């Protein structure tokens, strides 16, 4: 997914052209099916927006492509226009448990300077997300806890009583054998450090 370019996003460096090519190929060859879950559509949208962030369309090319068009379905770094954001209304009224689960699945979207409807939903429900983080830790669901922690670090505004930094340390200690957990925890730390500067 888009986390392939995460080091470039977090450190503000140009990605390796080979990494861009791999992500571009994934976007083009594996578009979501029309009946794909919302999380799949959002993941695909984020891969496209990440590619465009580092490899924008050629100068002078404009236009918009939607998810129903051929370009929208498989458009990457060389595409023209933009891929429309999928619907995120399903997040607004989701119970906090489901909300946290869905956001942890969408943790790759939790990056700085990448606004989206999912990010706005997360920012509007930081208390629910903090609750979900604690619940995931108590249930020993380290991947969900790491994903929720990454969102909290990306958007800020978590309750001070949460102790996110120590919570992330614990999540990494207990679940760090899973590379996805380690990735989310380290991304969260980098974003929290950048916010503190």
Q: What is the predicted function of each stretch?
A:
Residues 1-139, 143-151, 155-197:
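Polar/charged low-complexity regulatory segments
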């Amino acid at each position: 997914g888009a986390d392939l370019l995460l080091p470039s996003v977090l450190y503000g460096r140009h990605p390796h052209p080979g990494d861009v090519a791999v992500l571009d190929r994934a976007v083009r060859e594996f578009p979501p099916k029309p009946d794909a879950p919302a999380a799949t559509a959002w993941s695909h949208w984020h891969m496209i927006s990440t590619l465009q962030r580092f490899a924008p369309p050629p100068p002078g090319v404009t236009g918009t492509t939607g998810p129903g068009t051929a370009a929208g379905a498989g458009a990457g770094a060389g595409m023209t226009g933009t891929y429309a954001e999928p619907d995120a209304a399903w997040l607004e009224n989701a119970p906090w448990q489901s909300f946290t689960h869905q956001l942890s699945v969408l943790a790759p979207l939790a990056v700085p300077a990448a606004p989206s409807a999912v990010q706005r939903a997360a920012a509007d429900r930081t208390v629910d997300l903090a609750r979900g983080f604690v619940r995931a830790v108590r249930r020993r669901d380290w991947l969900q806890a790491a994903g929720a922690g990454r969102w909290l670090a990306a958007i800020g505004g978590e309750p001070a009583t949460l102790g996110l930094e120590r919570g992330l340390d614990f999540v990494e200690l207990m679940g760090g054998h899973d590379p996805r957990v380690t990735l989310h925890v380290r991304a969260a730390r980098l974003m929290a450090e950048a916010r503190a500067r």
